[in-house]
């Protein structure tokens, strides 16, 4: 599959997320002659073990995330960051987990927005919202370079594209910027050839940062 970078919006100190940011981002894409292709949606669930016996606590991961991706609707991805494990499963695994009741979904977020084609690039821009709530907790942008699946080969082209993109965004004087956090996929046993597992790991790390930010805000 095409190489993908997952960027997240980093607001300036004191500013917050809003739908206005999404509007400005989509206008920037359209100003670069991006063609709207439709909508997209992904979901991310945050699981914790339901332990009957606390003595067994060490045998179970303390937490992990489950992710459904729009490009792989029949699959479900689990990421256990603490053990550097990423697993692809059939989407029906969610029903099995509910029946087993060994893990409980504590939090759910969905990512939804618009998808654009811009030359050889596909851009997905979306808001991050907790299920059963309207508060925007984040803004993400997926950048795919369609002709190449090798991360090493695509890196320079992706960096050049992002320079053009950041320049276009800077004209709008928004209170923040998109940030690309480079991850060490090798620690998860993933190679240079991009796969949906790479995307799942990216979302898992995004989720970890998001949860930390939410908890810091409450603190």
Swiss-Prot record:
One of its GO terms (cellular component) is mediator complex. GO terms for biological process: regulation of transcription by RNA polymerase II. It holds the Pfam family Med20. InterPro entries: Mediator_Med20 (IPR013921). Keywords: Nucleus, Transcription, Transcription regulation. GO terms for molecular function: transcription coregulator activity. It is found in: Nucleus. The keyword Membrane does not apply. Its main location: nucleus. It comes from the Eukaryota. Component of the Mediator complex, a coactivator involved in the regulated transcription of nearly all RNA polymerase II-dependent genes. Mediator functions as a bridge to convey information from gene-specific regulatory proteins to the basal RNA polymerase II transcription machinery. The Mediator complex, having a compact conformation in its free form, is recruited to promoters by direct interactions with regulatory proteins and serves for the assembly of a functional preinitiation complex with RNA polymerase II and the general transcription factors. Belongs to the Mediator complex subunit 20 family. Component of the Mediator complex. This is Mediator of RNA polymerase II transcription subunit 20b. It comes from Arabidopsis thaliana.
